[in-house]
Amino acid sequence: MSDDSELTHVTDDGDAQMVDVGEKPDTARRAVARGEITLQPSTVAAIETNDVEKGDVLAVARVGAIQAVKHTWETVPMCHQIPITNVDTEFSTSETAVELTVAVETTGKTGCEMEALEGVTTGLNVVWDMVKAAEKDADGQYPDTGIDSVEVIEKEKRAL
């Protein structure tokens, strides 16, 4: 952190506060986040062929990701409720992973990167929930399963 940066969600006394964005002009904003869940190759193959007992994993995860984007303000304490104008979700698979990319757009006074991150993490949690029976080992643990590399990969702000 640079010397001139300050924590915007904390008062001088150290109390939590929501940032006042009331005076900021509306701008067009877009944020893209990504992450991946590592799985056993047999689980990824079952997802790709829609052969998972609970149903279409990626369809359910897509709905979960979109719902999470729309409800970020309810789960991240200092997030503003923003008007979401668009959500795009994209899944890709490799032999041992499912990657989810979520792009969020809004027009308003504050960005939407937290919404994109919330969409990714919830979407990947839904994947885990849908395949957990296949991922458990004999002891009920998940030695091959993990959510990793969650990050914001793009952020845009354009004047209207």
From Swiss-Prot:
Keywords: Lyase, Molybdenum cofactor biosynthesis
Disulphide connectivity of cysteines: none
Amino acids binding substrate: M78, C79, H80, M114, E115
UniProt similarity note: Belongs to the MoaC family.
Keyword Lyase attached: yes
Pfam families reported for this sequence: MoaC (PF01967)
GO annotation terms (biological process): Mo-molybdopterin cofactor biosynthetic process
Recorded catalytic activity of this chain's protein: (8S)-3',8-cyclo-7,8-dihydroguanosine 5'-triphosphate = cyclic pyranopterin phosphate + diphosphate
Pathway field: Cofactor biosynthesis; molybdopterin biosynthesis
SUBUNIT field: Homohexamer; trimer of dimers.
Residues annotated as catalytic: D129
Protein name, as recorded: Probable cyclic pyranopterin monophosphate synthase
Top-rank lineage group of the source organism: Archaea
EC number of this enzyme: 4.6.1.17
Upper classification of the organism: Archaea, Methanobacteriati, Methanobacteriota, Stenosarchaea group, Halobacteria
Annotated stretches, region: Disordered: 1-24
Task performed by this protein: Catalyzes the conversion of (8S)-3',8-cyclo-7,8-dihydroguanosine 5'-triphosphate to cyclic pyranopterin monophosphate (cPMP).
GO MF terms held by the record: cyclic pyranopterin monophosphate synthase activity
InterPro entries assigned to the protein according to its UniProt record, in alphabetical order: Mo_CF_biosynth-C_arc, MoaC, MoaC_sf, MoCo_biosynth_MoaA/MoaC, Mopterin_CF_biosynth-C_dom
Record field: compositional bias (Basic and acidic residues): 1-12
